[in-house]
Amino acid sequence: MESATHISIMPKIDGYDIVSIGEEAFANCTSLQSVTIPASVTEIGSAAFYGCTALTKVTVPDAVTKIEQGTFFSCTALTDLTLGKDTTEIGDMAFGYCTSLETVTLPDTVETLGDQLFYYCTALDEVQIPEKVTELGGYTFYGCMSLKSFTVPKNLENIGAMSFVACPSLETIAVEDGNTKYQAVDNVLYDTEESILYLYPAGRTDTSFTLPESTLVVYAGAFFAAGNLQQINFDEKLQYIGEMAFDFCSGLTSLTIPKAVTTIGTTAFADCTGLTSVTFSGASDEDGGEGGDLEIGDYAFFCDDNLKEVQLPKRVSSVGKYAFGCTSPADDDDSEDYVTVSSDSGDNLKVKALDGFLLIGYTGAASDYVKDCDVKISFKAMNVNWKAVMLWGILAVVLVAVLLIAIRLIRRNMMTAEEKKALQEAEAEHKIPLSQRGKQDEAAEEKPEYDDGYRSILDDDDEDEAEEVADYEQTISHSQLHHIGHADMPAAEDEKKDKEDEKDEK
């Protein structure tokens, strides 16, 4: 069956009516170009024609009231689709990746539309939502590159998150009269109070936009890929910036986050490659400013490759993973200076530190982000806990003192008796005034032995005797002079004695 190009399903087999086409019945029949479904069929299973990439035309019988999940998913050649007039429900991704589908007519009987209904229908440029539909699922028109306009029906009460993300051609948004939930002001979609901005069409040519004073919330994906936008002005009352709100706004060059903002969602400003300046109002206020705690989501400023410095306010209570100073290496980047992480979609993502980036903030959430990040990010602290620094300093001094005392005691216990005696003498010497230390040494000297001058009568060496007598006389004279205060010392002897005394004092 995989090679069949045209299939006509018989209405009966062996006398039994064909009422159902099972799940994945024709899945991945890549040669199938057309199929004829009999009127007796009331049910078509999920993914029944999944991956029929050559299928160009399908007519669904009126008796089929529900199109199941993924029924025509990835029928990339499908251009002509007719649904039964009694259809009431269409499941998730029923027409996802039907990249050739340009127009779809949904019967007025339809009441329920699933999530991602027209996911990446890149050729779809026009579709009307039936009046009975009250809710649009999330990501309904995600990736509809050719969609130029959309009208919100009067009974629509809820537009799912990211419903118009990646619709770069969308220029016009309108709301039918009688809708009590939404309004369009200058082709921008708000709630009736203008407190929530739901959608700024990405195809607008404006280079700047100012939010109304009444706007408190920027909805998820509201400005996604608004490539012409270079400047966004937030009112000081703004409180919430949703997930992917400004993702891929590559023209943005600078922005200021008001003090009142308490949440910046995941990837809110990711891939803003032109962004060079981000200012958080009150970032330099050490008291935290007037706003409440600020939570910054994962990847909030990821891949903002020209953003080199950000100063965070003290009121930041949490910073998500890879929110600042991180990027994804280019495909031709041969360096291994990156980490591989699992993204929310389950895919592996390479992350590396952004060269030259500096995060400035306070100890707490900001410093914890840098400490816990898998890649190395430069950080400058705005505050220092001086009490903690002083306490640690005192403890360090005490520890050093205790350590020195312990070392001294250990060394004393290891000394020999001679070393201990020498140490005691040195300590005693240290207690004597400097002016008295030399005199104490002189007093302690042993007096020379007295020689009565008698010589052996057998010694007849005159020269030796003369030398001995000279020594004797000098010894007597020197000894006597010590006792009488140098009274009778000749001049030469005085000079010699002075030199010796100076030497002793030294």
Language model features with spans:
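Structural signature of tandem-repeat unit edges
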Residues: 3-19, 30-43, 53-66, 76-89, ...
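Alpha-helical transmembrane segments
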Residues: 400-409
